[in-house]
Every structure is written in structure tokens, then in C-alpha cells.
UniProtKB/Swiss-Prot annotation:
Protein species of origin: Mus musculus (Mouse)
This protein's UniProt keywords: DNA-binding, Metal-binding, Nucleus, Phosphoprotein, Transcription, Transcription regulation, Zinc, Zinc-finger
Molecular function as annotated in GO: DNA binding; zinc ion binding
Gene: Tcea3
Protein name (record): Transcription elongation factor A protein 3
Region spans: Disordered: 83-168
Annotated positions of the Phosphoserine modification: 113, 139
Length: 347
């Protein structure tokens, strides 16, 4: 069995362990990987780094996590090594454009180029078909047109649905570096959207922060708290995204990028805590107005200090007695606390 086949087999085993949340035996597989002579081409073709990173994030065994970190660090150093040969560098650049496998020098624009080429290539194909129909009388020009059409069809073959660089697949791979992938499509998409929210304005570059890494940490804290990707998880992520992208609340995004608000804190903050100062003041004003209206709406009654409010524990109350049942039944007493506006009744 070749080294590439062995790495593919190990990667499949690690992915199954992560999906089943059973990582027994992962240490032995990582030790095998540590003894393998790794190359850039093997890292790109087998995607072993994604599998090892998934084990690192989901395994609770400290020894396994430590060895996984060492492997990822060594492989990153291999990718960034200036001593790689010219051929390897060319292969690496080509692979990054097609599959988005680069981690340190990764750029999202390269992954978005295939859809633009496809969109721009369709009008040319239609014009060529019109030219070919109009030139049926001139037989010498037909072979050249056929050759050009065949060459263009060869160029367009990578964009077929069976190709790995289809428009629907390429952005999903290229928008997020492999070292931040979780192996779960829902979680990966949430990390992408959180990263986009952090990059909502161009000034994010002034903070010198890796937005993909920061978004991955925020998502990981949310997932570790909720332990699933159900509707509660999605609503939590959605509220972070809407508040980070809110142009009327730039202070929140600025505090997250500068580190004043940690990823763990932003993952647990409530909507009231994430709100801007202006919105907080508006909410407080509306609350006070509602309390005043509630207190003004009270009807006349008898003030007494014999009844204690169960909410504020004070004895400043007003009560009314009304016959709500038959005449031989006791009257119902309606009580209003003059301090906090709490209402209750008893017979």
C-alpha cells in the first residue's frame, strides 16, 4: 500500500471517529502520521490536515490534542517553508486556485474566479455559434471555427457538475481556510457568516486580526455550550451576526476586533448586552414610560398598609372589593401596589 493510500485510509478513520464522537485509537493513528515523511503534494491530495484538525477540536484526550497540534504546526511550517522546490510551489499555487487548500497564504478571491469565468464564457460561446451558422458557405473557415469551439469546450469542462470546481462547490471550499473547518457543513457556514460580519467594514484591517480565526473561536464557544446545531444554536449565531453587522452599533464590532470583548463573552451575551448605548437608553425610556402609564391607570380604592406586596415586599397598597360571584359568596379583593405597580387578587 502506497503512502498516499495509507494517508487517505487514516483520514477516513479520523473523520469517522469525529462524526461518531468516539476517538479511541486516534493516538495510534496520529503516531503513524508523525512517523510519515509528509510532502506538500500529499497534504493537498489527501486533506489529512482537515481530519487531524477535526480530532484536535473534538477530542478530550490531552495527549491526542497535543500530538494533533504538533502535527498541524509541522505541516504549516512545511507549507510556509521557503526551501520548497519551484515545481512544488507551482503545484501548491495551482492547488490553492482550484481547491482552496492553502492555509497561510489563502485568499478568497482565487476561489471565486471560476464562476466569473463561466459567466463571461457563455456569451462568447453563443457568438461563436452564430458565426459558425453564418459561415456555412465558406468551407475554409469552418475547420478553424470547429477547432476554436473544441478548445473552448475543453476550457469549460472543469465547470461541469461532476468537476470539483463547480460554482456551487468552489465557494464553499475557498471561503474558509482548511485549518478552520469543523467537518460539519452547518458549523462551517456559520463560521463563514461570522467572519463576513466581522469584515463588514474595511477598517477591520487596522486591527491586524485574523477574522476567520476569531469567527471560528466564537462559533466553537457557542457549540461547546449548546452541544448541537439545532434552532437554538442557529438563533444564537444569527443574533451575533445581526448585531456585528448593525451600522448603528459599530462599537460592538470594534470591541470584538480589538479584544475588549473576548470570543467567549460575545458567544454568551444577550441581546440587551449587545445593544448600542442609544438603543439601551431608548429601551430604558420606554420601560419607565410603561411603568408610569401602568401606575396612572389605577382606579380609586382604599389605601392600606396591612397588605404586603410579594414583589417589592412593601406595604403601600390600594385595594378594591368587588362582588364577582353570587351574593352568598365572599367578595373578591383586587390589590394594587403603589410602589412597583404589581397587581393581585384574593377572596
Amino acid at each position: 500500500m502506497g503512502l498516499e493510500e495509507e494517508l487517505l485510509r487514516i483520514a477516513k478513520k479520523l473523520e469517522k471517529m469525529v462524526s461518531r464522537k468516539k476517538t479511541e485509537g486516534a493516538l495510534d493513528l496520529l503516531k503513524k502520521l508523525n512517523s510519515c515523511q509528509m510532502s506538500i503534494q500529499l497534504l493537498q491530495t489527501t486533506r489529512i490536515g482537515v481530519a487531524v484538525n477535526g480530532v484536535r477540536k473534538h477530542c478530550s484526550d490531552k495527549e491526542v490534542v497535543s500530538l494533533a497540534k504538533v502535527l498541524i504546526k509541522n505541516w504549516k511550517r512545511l507549507l510556509d517553508s521557503p526551501r520548497t522546490t519551484k515545481g512544488e510551489r507551482e503545484e501548491r499555487e495551482k492547488a490553492k486556485k482550484e481547491k482552496g487548500l492553502g492555509c497561510s497564504d489563502w485568499k478568497p478571491e482565487a476561489g471565486l474566479s471560476p464562476p466569473r469565468k463561466k459567466g463571461g464564457g457563455e456569451p462568447k460561446t453563443r457568438r461563436d455559434s452564430v458565426d459558425s451558422r453564418s459561415s456555412t458557405t465558406s468551407s475554409p473557415k469552418r475547420p478553424s471555427l470547429e477547432r476554436s469551439n473544441s478548445s473552448k469546450s475543453k476550457v469549460e469542462t472543469p465547470t461541469t457538475p461532476s468537476s470539483p470546481s463547480t460554482p456551487t462547490f468552489a465557494p464553499a471550499v475557498c471561503l474558509l481556510a482548511p485549518c478552520y473547518l469543523t467537518g460539519d457543513s452547518v458549523r462551517d457556514k456559520c463560521v463563514e457568516m461570522l467572519s463576513a460580519a466581522l469584515k463588514a467594514e474595511d477598517n477591520f484591517k487596522d486591527y491586524g486580526v485574523n477574522c476567520d480565526k476569531l469567527a471560528s473561536e466564537i462559533e466553537d464557544h457557542i457549540y461547546q455550550e449548546l452541544k448541537s446545531t439545532d434552532m437554538k444554536y442557529r438563533n444564537r449565531v444569527r443574533s451575533r451576526i445581526s448585531n456585528l453587522k448593525d451600522p448603528r452599533n459599530p462599537g460592538l464590532r470594534r470591541n470584538v476586533l480589538s479584544g475588549a470583548i473576548s470570543p467567549e463573552l460575545i458567544a454568551k451575551m444577550t441581546a440587551e448586552e449587545m445593544a448600542s448605548d442609544e438603543l439601551r437608553e431608548l429601551r430604558n425610556a420606554m420601560t419607565q414610560e410603561a411603568i408610569r402609564e401602568h401606575q396612572m391607570a389605577k382606579t380609586g380604592g382604599t389605601t392600606t398598609d396591612l397588605l404586603r406586596c410579594s414583589k417589592c415586599k412593601k406595604k403601600n397598597c390600594t385595594y378594591n372589593q368587588v362582588q364577582t360571584r353570587s351574593a352568598d359568596e365572599p367578595m373578591t379583593t383586587f390589590v394594587l401596589c403603589n410602589e412597583c405597580g404589581n397587581r393581585w387578587k384574593f377572596c
